[in-house]
Amino acid sequence: MSEEVKKDQEPQTEAPKKKVAAKKEEAPAEKPAAKPAAPKKPKDKPYIDMPTCVGCSVCIEACPMDCIQLSEPKFHGDIRTYAYLSDEKKCIGCGMCEKACPIDVITMCQPGEIPDKYTKGETSMCQDLFKVYCRVFQAVMKVGNYFMGYRMPDYIQGAGCIKQLPGIIKSKGLTKVLVVTDGGLLKLGVPDGLFEAMKEVGLEYEVFSNIIHNPTSDNVEEGYKLFRETGCQGLIAFGGGAPMDCAKAIAAKNAHPNKTVAQMQGLLKVHKKICPFWAVPTTSGTGSETTVAAVITDSATHHKASINDPSILPKYAVLDPELTIGLPPYVTAQTGMDALCHAVESYTNWTYCTALEKDLSKKAVRLIYDNLLTAYEDGKNFEARQNMQIAAFYAGRSFTRGCVGYVHAVGHTLGGLYGIAHGQAMSVILPHVMAQYGPAVYDKLADLADVCGMTGVTNEEKAKKFIAWIREMNEKMNIPKGFQQIKDEDIPQMITWAKAEANPLYPVPVIWGDDDFRRLIHTLQTAE
Amino acid sequence: MESKYSGYMGRVVMYDLSTQTLTDYPWSDRERELFIGGKTMASKIMLDNFTGQEKPFSEENLIVITTGPLTGTGAPSSSRFNISTLSPQTLITTSSNCGGRFGWYLKKAGFDALILKGKCPEHSWLEINNDKFVMHNADDLWGLKTGETQEALQEKHKMPNGKLMKYGQLAIGPAGENQVLYASVISDERASGRGGVGAVFGWKNLKAITVRGNKTVPVKDPEKTKQWIIKWDKYIKSHPLTGNQLPRLGTAGLVSSMQMRGMLSSKNYNYGKYEHFDKVNGETLAEDFNIVNKGCLTCPMKCARTVEVNGKPVKGPELETLGLLGGGILNPNLADILKWNYEIDELGMDTISASSTLAYAMEANEKGLWKNGLEFGKTDNISQIWDDVAHRRGIGAELADGSKRLSEKYGGKEFAIHSKGMELAAYEPRRAVGQGLGYAVSNRGGCHLNGGYLVIVEGLGLYTNPLTHHAKADFTMLFQNLMETISASGQCLFTSYAFFPGFLITRPNGVITTIANKAIPFIGGVLRLINRVSPALALHLPVFHHTKIFSYALGMPMTFGKYIRTGERSYNVERLVNSKFGVNASWDTLPKRLTDTPQDPNNPKTKVPLETLKKTYYKARGWDQNGLPTKHTLRKLGLGEYC
Amino acid sequence: MINVELFGLFRLDTKIKGFELDPSAEGVSTVKDIYPILLKKAKEVNPATKICAKDIDGCIIIINGVQSKKSAHVNDGDKIQLMSPVCGG
């Protein structure tokens, strides 16, 4: 079922599926059903704050169960060792370590939580001044956002609507386009329907598919060369985030042939009209069809950074759920959680969002809550696929103005250094960052919990339930809890890159310093 | 007496080993302000209790175990404690500092200090659990080496569920039991090595002490203390000496530098270099033998080595042991030194005195003064020698008395390398005359640290003219004063090395460093003034974090000037109590080899101009020509009652 | 030949104990001329090394037992020792 091109309106979703609990079989009338025992809360365990621990070993001395150890020195003479809970099972939760620690880096709490005192962000005179600078910057950006002209792309929606695209392109006067996609989709024949439709209407095309998970500056240069040398006039980005971002960067390069990709990375460095650009997402998703960002890895330095400019926001999008039916479960999971990450980060960020973006975030979260697991377990479920596509669209539009946060900043470094797929990075990192923000995000996460029908007495409780739900989703969809492959020697570089990307642009709930990033990365390294 | 200051537990006790009675020993806040704790507190206690007639091996001799107020607060490197007593080696008081966990647990039991007098009627070990003191028979422990003793103590400290209690411990080995004059006391892997404190334990039939408790050391301002600790820790870890050299090379890293400066004593201080130094230096130790570096509780520097001996990871040697058992006896085999270091620790002896006495014996044999079969470079019998010494067997019985007594018996006083009866520590002072002064005037005998450790400016860290006497006396006094207070507060002396701004170390050829090195001999007058008017220096130096921690953790106001003055007082208290036992200028000596024989026959300056240095030093200290504090000095230091 | 020996942390960092060089063949007339040769050797031993000239400047330079500077001249037969400052006790 296809529809007329919609301009700057929200796409229609399938009626939201209400989660209806299965009816319990009625117990025999004589015996009232026994109330299930409330799950026993696990014992508090020591949270030892790795970045601020000085390795004095006083806690090790105080522990009666010998379940705290000093980390292994990384080289002979390494003195930057720190205490850690080496045997959680042995720990009896006595709190002697917390009492003994002279610098208050140990606090007893529920396993997996980060006590509030370590979530306030690094404090020092320099850091406090820097935080003020960031907030002033963001306040100015907020005003500037009003002049940015964010919009929803014009779009067509519905099963099979991809076949209409060539006709629409031809009606704009174009005769040749470059289709940017990835080799995997080509092999699977996913774009074949588009190619046939283009042949039918006589629209010429070239295909550029030399793109990996995280497109590189070399990919962009190669794609642009093909675009220019074959006389293409427009671009179709067909696929997930990688072809989308690559195509956007090719469009930017086409607007500025003499600039390198690195020179266009950052804020507002394109500011020129690009060639006609259609975005056809086949994942749900990066939302890249609605965003002003294109994330490209520099081939020489492996630094992943974003071109951020409203100029590269696609003018048109094609939302055809049939294109996502064949997505393997793991891609469904990772891209779905990527969409969730967009919605959550945008919503929890400070000041940039207007009521529209907040509303879109909430809608996206609810759609993901209702549909992602279904889409993961039953890929052929049309409604789930369609709703996930819409969710990704909403979330993408939301973060276009609301921005992303440290989940993305750190995730990009993993993509650059270890080639970790963006969606996987987002899925894994999201719950850890939200937990580390602590009370700063309780209210907003509680709103999202409300949207999903989660209950709780306090906002803190609801927020923690929401984070627990994210972890649960990851577990159900076989997404790992952390990244043990992160090497210690890469951490300084990761922190430098993440800070450069996020501070001061991203209006994150808590502005982090080096120790805060170390805390997160340590959590990622050690999460099991 | 309870204290208004934090950091102190408020209780000092005296335990009579003869009658097994415990009494409280009065200790006021005024005394805490003047003497802080640690070795200074011990000296004051000995000053008030000794008449000068006491003998080391007597019931009247006290063993004074003191902690510092910073122990238990978490300050960097603050877990050190002190054992002081009348030394059987020097016959004057000695203080012996240690990084083991005993002091930490003594405070958890609720005590700032423990004074022992009397004598156990039988072989005993003392168990302290909070304020409960229980004496146990130690026949099953007597004869065991220190490691074995500590393992056996573990069995005695297991809870019904099999878990080991947490406690601190002291133990002597066979050397202490047999009253080897330089027997040590071991705490975990660390040693109260010098001065023969272990022999006093042994004479008193005290094999071991364990202590545990559940009290908390109070901290005045936990938040400010925490921030200061974090800041100080970062500073220490980023300093080239404390954060790079000490962890990666340990004190062993000095061997090559000493060789280059001619300060590496070899063949019993006949020479200042050793041709095979590269086989027994810190680099070889790091590259081929070190397993991991370890640290005392709360220490960020983690300078201790761990090596493998007989397939077991054990504590590795410090610089002095490497020097004295390497070039000192012409042994180029590092593996032997590692083995001997372990054996000596296990037997419970001071590695420095043991090695230096051995070297004396080798030279005496070589010169035909004493036929003992010991030869430089002959190393196949040395393990047996240590065992014989510890058990006073054969020539071991003679070696057990140290080089001073041996030289009095056999001759060769000029090459019995000791001062006041305690052997010197491998740094050859004829190429670092300021260190030579320090050795001679050190209160406990031939100690390089108590002597001011001037080698750090005479060629190892900085490199001012090592042969001039100018300014050396004043520098010695300043460094001694600072280090006294560091020790008294419970911290490790190595924290003071970060006093030298990092760029002076990382830019040895830089303009400022060059100027500083050239200027040092000319600033004696300035240092004299600083020492004289120290209380006026009511400031804190950014390179010296030790002062602010006093106000934050203890609530005791402290400035850089007051810190120096407190150290000066400490040094004088020690001098006072030793003067009761006859110490004066005639005791501040070095063997003639170091004062009369140039190390380089072509350079007459390569010997220690001790008399010149002493003269200046006494003046700087405010002592008379006899090397004793004047009344004016004592009054200035608040010690007027001892005039 | 000139004999160059490394000690202290500098030796641990470069993983070089020492080496010989022919001053005339290598164009070495001062200590500073040895720097590129030493850095090249350090790179050969450990391609990932971050040792640079600044680290050599951080060493005490001793030529034939006498402390010197990097501008000091060196001759055939000289022994040069590079040593990091140390402390202990």
Feature locations, PLM:
Chain C
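Ubiquitin-like/PB1-type beta-grasp interaction modules and other compact soluble beta-rich domains
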Residues: 1-88
